[in-house]
Amino acid sequence: MAGGLPHPVLLSTFMGMDEITIGGQVVEFKHVFYSWVCMAILFAVAWVLRRRLTLVPGGLQNFFEAMVDTIENFIVSTMGENGRKFVPLLAGIFIYIFGMNLMGLVPGFDAPTANLNTTVCMALFVLVFYNAVGLIRWKTHYIHHFTGPSKFLIPLMFPLEVVSHLSRPVSLSLRLFGNIRGEEIVMVLFFIMAPILGTLPIYALFLLGKTMQAFVFFMLTMFYIKGALEAPEH
């Protein structure tokens, strides 16, 4: 399966485990099930790496340490020292979305991000989180992010800012869903039109696209948090 589409190589690996029957109605929850599968895989990898930590890193430890250091340096260079406390969250968002994106490349699995429900939930979490960060940091003064520098501009600025903030989860969710879903459809078409071995090189292109979509979501989340931490105009 791939985003609800028949997978070109295998049927769903966990056929029958991604749906339940309630009152005679079949309710599918592939996106939830495969999100849990992704979390389980990431937790398992983290647990194995934690047990094998050494003072002289090698192999996977070296790779993951380099990746985390790169992400941390990027966040701190963009947000300043205030951003260091958000490294676990932002790095987790990137790795989690990247992992869910990659599941669409594995025969028999779905990419949860090819389902709009998943991306909407992620985007709504970002909306609530960065506004909560702003409220905690600036208390009631955070409202000035929405009203502008002058009280005379409130009737104009407030509705514009509200619409602007509400459009962020819409943009985040539709961008991620549309790109991943589109890639899943194109991948199915490639496998239909050509032999399996002949289409394997296209996986590199899909891998790049899925990486970029996770990075874009991560970047925008970081900038939204950074904006909430900035001093509001009075």
UniProtKB/Swiss-Prot annotation:
It is a multi-pass membrane protein. The keyword Hydrolase does not apply. PROSITE patterns: ATPASE_A. Its main location: membrane. One of its GO terms (biological process) is proton motive force-driven plasma membrane ATP synthesis. One of its GO terms (cellular component) is proton-transporting ATP synthase complex. Signal peptide: none annotated. It is found in: Cell inner membrane. One of its GO terms (molecular function) is proton-transporting ATP synthase activity, rotational mechanism. CDD domains: ATP-synt_Fo_a_6 (cd00310). Key component of the proton channel; it plays a direct role in the translocation of protons across the membrane. Belongs to the ATPase A chain family. This is ATP synthase subunit a. It comes from Desulfovibrio desulfuricans (strain ATCC 27774 / DSM 6949 / MB).
